[in-house]
Amino acid sequence: GRTTVFDDPLRPGRRGSELLPIILETHKPEDLIILMLGTNDCKTFYGATAGSIGLGIRKLVRQIRDGAPSAKILLMSPIALGEKVWDGFDPEFGKNSVQVSKELPEIYRQIAEEEGLYYLAASDYAVPSERDQEHMDEDGHKALAEAVLAKISEIL
């Protein structure tokens, strides 16, 4: 998965702040950009707080404004991690990762308000699957897709 601003020591080329300018340049013109990153920033080896992840999101918002100044921005906070994501599912996460992931919606909401962005909390519509405690199941994807469609219709 991708991160906001962190280099993944196990998977090179995953830092959003490195990839985003290229994506913006190759996808012009942009009417609406949906930004939803942060789950992978919760991995234990980054030691990130929700606030520091928020700083990464702010950097990405600045990059979007620089690369696509006329685009509207929908900031989405990701779903929270499951309570036992580290226990037999994904050892890159720990107990603190779950707590940090639960703090992201409020941080992202504040950023959206301060930056004049549209906002949607994925955790209002979906939860992590029992299968891996990290990703949505089919019902979660469907519920979130319907919410995103409604939000896009409202924005555009």
Features from the language model and the residues they span:
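Short, internal active-site loops enriched in acidic
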Residues: 40, 79-82, 126-127
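Alpha-helical structural signal in soluble globular domains
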Residues: 59, 63, 67, 103, ...
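Short helix/strand-capping connector loops at secondary-structure junctions
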Residues: 122-132
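Substrate-gating cap/lid alpha-helix
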Residues: 81-121
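Histidine-centered active-site loop/cap adjacent to the catalytic His
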Residues: 132-156
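Structural beta-sheet core signal
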Residues: 35, 74-76
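Surface-exposed helix-capping loop/turn segments at secondary-structure junctions
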Residues: 66-71, 119, 154-156
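Conserved SGNH/GDSL esterase-like catalytic core that processes O-acyl groups on lipids
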Residues: 1-63, 69, 84, 99-103, ...
